[in-house]
Amino acid sequence: MSFLLTIAKEYKRLCQDAKAAQMMTVGTVSNYTTFKKWTTSRKEKNPSLRMRWAMSSKFPIIANKRMLEEAQIPKEHNNVALWEDTEDVSKRDHVLASASCINYWNFCGPCVNNSEVIKEVYKSRFGRLERRKEIMWKELRFTLVDRQRRRVDTQPVEQRLRTGEIKDLQMWTLFEDEAPLASKFILDNYGLVKEMRSKFANKPLNKEVVAHMLEKQFNPESRFLPVFGAIRPERMELIHALGGETWIQEANTAGISNVDQRKNDMRAVCRKVCLAANASIMNAKSKLVEYIKSTSMRIGETERKLEELILETDDVSPEVTLCKSALGGPLGKTLSFGPMLLKKISGSGVKVKDTVYIQGVRAVQFEYWSEQEEFYGEYKSATALFSRKERSLEWITIGGGINEDRKRLLAMCMIFCRDGDYFKDAPATITMADLSTKLGREIPYQYVMMNWIQKSEDNLEALLYSRGIVETNPGKMGSSMGIDGSKRAIKSLRAVTIQSGKIDMPESKEKIHLELSDNLEAFDSSGRIVATILDLPSDKKVTFQDVSFQHPDLAVLRDEKTAITKGYEALIKRLGTGDNDIPSLIAKKDYLSLYNLPEVKLMAPLIRPNRKGVYSRVARKLVSTQVTTGHYSLHELIKVLPFTYFAPKQGMFEGRLFFSNDSFVEPGVNNNVFSWSKADSSKIYCHGIAIRVPLVVGDEHMDTSLALLEGFSVCENDPRAPMVTRQDLIDVGFGQKVRLFVGQGSVRTFKRTASQRAASSDVNKNVKKIKMSN
């Protein structure tokens, strides 16, 4: 009883205050939703949404009043309320505060020295805030929006790493003693490990925070989202504000208007079309021109032809140079060597040939220049001025860039100048297989060396050591460079200096026209090679949702949904009367040619990789069985043909044939990917798009196509009749029945009735019988 009396007295005392009485009688104690959450066992279905709802209130958090007063944090800053002098009913000596109070504490509070560290920790979030400030909002339109759920990157990163690579980087950066054996990624990118260690050294950060920073710096945060339009990471982080099922908010995001981003996009597209043209055994130059003229890019809200963009740009990268040479456009006096861009400043060298021996057996020739020349070079963030003469790099000054970029730039300049011991004796690890491509083309020795330094960090440093190590002696334009690419090392590389700022590229008003060979080598009027396909960096898997590839050879570069549709459209166009068309190959039972059609090969990369062998076995069995029994539908054969390209392999089949984007087709069953109707066999629907099945001749009228069957009449369907091609009709005897493909997926049985008969009479009878049979 005494306990209840005590509670009653306390309640009476509290009710003396009007505000407290109202809270005790009308409202709830503290936040009801929070109270309910912590006093029930119900699992929160959407904790993220609840947190956002709670943080949207004016004062969603509480703070210690004494600490606020000691830190001299005002109640208001820049017209934004930070906290109010109202005690929280759930915790004594705490008052209500806003989220802005935390920002004030971090950047204007007593620990202001930590502000730079905080900006580094939340670098990705602050970057997102800055990008949102750059958005140019436009009109809001109401329309039906065709959205596709796709895996997209929601955060732009300077360098993208896989999850396993990020974990390796975290271990080797933070826990060197406990790190596992070095993976191939660590061996190839040890310079990045050292850079990260130096970046976070002597900073007041615990290892958990640094691990978080590393993950956010290299992880693009991929998500499956319903998207439309271009799928740049800068746009995907705002996709929720740019459109829904029935509305679109027009806006120019930071990534779309960024000049550097557009330049990188164009380089990626040019690299793709160059590599695709190089894969052609013959006429690579003409193929490249076809690919360029059939491609367009979206710049903001405008669709522009790739051909125009290439001719307008002043980019001197090797991929753009090759494309511009193919189009006959003028260029400045520039050249490229691998991923390094070069521009000659002065001098004119004379070519001299020399020989180096591979494994002491095979002699390989290479060229060098006997006269002195000066060049400007650029690789990623590093730039350089250097001079070459004979087989040596006389001197080099490197400006700007991180240590790793400076090292790689120096190594490429050494190879370009044929400097170092490895142009006298080849490295022992270079084998005969490194001297040619998969297609059997010979690789020049300088490019063999370029590939060699890319294989491991040890190879790169071995080449740099061949430059020669001397006591540190600062140069005129900057400090000496050590073997690790840093300044003011105890031991430095011979005649290599560093300056803090970047070196500006010298202007060149003189324009030249380059010729492009079928080997995709661009050379000037004197025969000097300016760029070659070997200069292109290794291909990366990049998808282009804001680029339109119209050429059928480039179908695999489109987004997968469009590529599947275009692939089926190309297969349907093969339903003709030619010897190499699908009906003729079926009639001849030439399965090998059927499975290796160019259209089938183009769709091969769209098949789920880990199941392609199993799908091929099932699809080939379906095709051969149906053709052998004579009970088949051309529509169904077209559906499974893309899955027949690969070598068959035993395995469990689930009943569906999946593409790599998780869409699928099912034999004998219509779905949104591939569907057709027996009532109207003239059309096939792929992803809702109607594709017309062609007739056997280039005529739009069914009756005139039958005029070619003079001496035959349509009869009742006979599955026992042999399937023949149009060319084999001359061998059919009087009274014999044959089956023939007549167009739009239809197969009819014909009987030889006479050796000669008026075509018009046959047409009238045949048309009537076909209409009756339908």
UniProtKB/Swiss-Prot annotation:
One GO CC term on file: host cell nucleus
Gene Ontology terms: biological process: 7-methylguanosine mRNA capping; cap snatching; DNA-templated transcription; symbiont-mediated suppression of host gene expression; symbiont-mediated suppression of host mRNA transcription via inhibition of RNA polymerase II activity; viral RNA genome replication
Keyword Phosphoprotein: no
Domain of life: Viruses
Pfam short name (any one): Flu_PB2_2nd
Molecular function terms, GO-annotated: RNA binding; RNA-directed RNA polymerase activity
UniProt entry keywords in alphabetical sequence: Cap snatching, Eukaryotic host gene expression shutoff by virus, Eukaryotic host transcription shutoff by virus, Host gene expression shutoff by virus, Host nucleus, Host-virus interaction, Inhibition of host RNA polymerase II by virus, mRNA capping, mRNA processing, Viral transcription, Virion
Entry keyword annotation includes tRNA processing: no
Main location: virion
Location relative to the cell: Virion; Host nucleus
Function: Plays an essential role in transcription initiation and cap-stealing mechanism, in which cellular capped pre-mRNAs are used to generate primers for viral transcription. Recognizes and binds a wide range of cap structures of target pre-RNAs which are subsequently cleaved after 10-13 nucleotides by the viral protein PA. Plays a role in the initiation of the viral genome replication and modulates the activity of the ribonucleoprotein (RNP) complex.
Family: Belongs to the influenza viruses PB2 family.
Subunit structure: Influenza RNA polymerase is composed of three subunits: PB1, PB2 and PA. Interacts (via N-terminus) with PB1 (via C-terminus). Interacts with nucleoprotein NP (via N-terminus).
Protein name: Polymerase basic protein 2
Organism: Influenza C virus (strain C/Ann Arbor/1/1950)
Gene that encodes it: PB2
